[in-house]
C-alpha cells in the first residue's frame, strides 16, 4: 500500500483565487489591497536584494543575472516589476487560471517571464535553485505550512535570500485583516483568510532554522487610511515581512 503524497495545495484556496483571477490587474477590483501594498514590498525587495548582491539600485536593470522565484505568483503583480528590473523570473502558482492570466498580461507587456502552473514541492523535487525566493502573501493559504516552508527554503541558493510576507495570528489581525477588511470594508472577498491558517513570526523563524536559513530582518507593514497607503512599521501585529538568507 502506498502512502499518500503530502501536498501544500488547499483545493478550496485554489478554487477561491481561480474564481476571481480575471481581476488580478484591475487596481480597483478584488485585488485592490495588493495593488496598494505592492509599492511598499517592491521597494523593500529591491533595497535588500541590491544591498545583498552589491547592485546599484539606481541602475536601470539592477537585478540583471539574478534568478528569482515568485511562489504563489497569482496574476504576476510581483513578477512583472522584478522582470523589468532585469531579474530572470519564474512565477509559479497552483492555479492554472492564475497562470493563464499572468501569461497573457506579460505578453501584452512584452515581458519574458517563465510562468508555471505547479507547486513549491514539485519545483523543489526538480532541484530548482534561486538567488531570491519571493514567498509573499501565500503561506497563509497553503494546507501544510511546514512542508511549504521546507520546499521553498530548499530552493534558496547558498548566499541567496528568501522574503516572506504574511499576516500574524493575533486578535488584532483577526479584527483588522479579516473582520475589518473582508466583512466591514469589503476590500477582499469574504473567506479570503482563515484565522487558524495565519502564521506567527516565530513559527517562520523556526522553519528557517530547521532549513538552515538565517533570519536577517523583520518588520511590520501598516495601513494609513488618510493617505490610503501602506508603510513600513515596527508593528508586526497584523501584516509583516521577514527576510532570511542561506549562508554562502
Swiss-Prot record:
Recorded metabolic or biological pathway in which this protein acts: Cofactor biosynthesis; ubiquinone biosynthesis
GO terms, molecular function? 2-polyprenyl-6-hydroxyphenol methylase activity; 3-demethylubiquinol 3-O-methyltransferase activity; polyprenyldihydroxybenzoate methyltransferase activity
Key words of the record: Methyltransferase, S-adenosyl-L-methionine, Transferase, Ubiquinone biosynthesis
What GO terms describe the biological role, i.e. biological process, of this protein? methylation
Judged by the first EC level, this protein's enzyme class is: transferase
Q: Which reaction does it catalyse?
A: a 3-demethylubiquinol + S-adenosyl-L-methionine = a ubiquinol + S-adenosyl-L-homocysteine + H(+); a 3-(all-trans-polyprenyl)benzene-1,2-diol + S-adenosyl-L-methionine = a 2-methoxy-6-(all-trans-polyprenyl)phenol + S-adenosyl-L-homocysteine + H(+)
- InterPro entries in the record: SAM-dependent_MTases_sf, UbiG_MeTrfase
Report the SUPFAM superfamilies cross-referenced here: S-adenosyl-L-methionine-dependent methyltransferases
Give residues annotated as binding S-adenosyl-L-methionine. 41, 72, 93, 136
Question: Does S-adenosyl-L-methionine appear among the keywords?
Answer: yes
Record's function text: O-methyltransferase that catalyzes the 2 O-methylation steps in the ubiquinone biosynthetic pathway.
Task: Please give the family membership noted in the entry.
Answer: Belongs to the methyltransferase superfamily. UbiG/COQ3 family.
Q: Which PANTHER family match?
A: METHYLTRANSFERASE (PTHR43464), UBIQUINONE BIOSYNTHESIS O-METHYLTRANSFERASE, MITOCHONDRIAL (PTHR43464:SF19)
HAMAP family according to UniProt = UbiG
Q: Quote the protein name from its UniProt record.
A: Ubiquinone biosynthesis O-methyltransferase
Species this chain originates from: Brucella canis (strain ATCC 23365 / NCTC 10854 / RM-666)
Annotated gene: ubiG
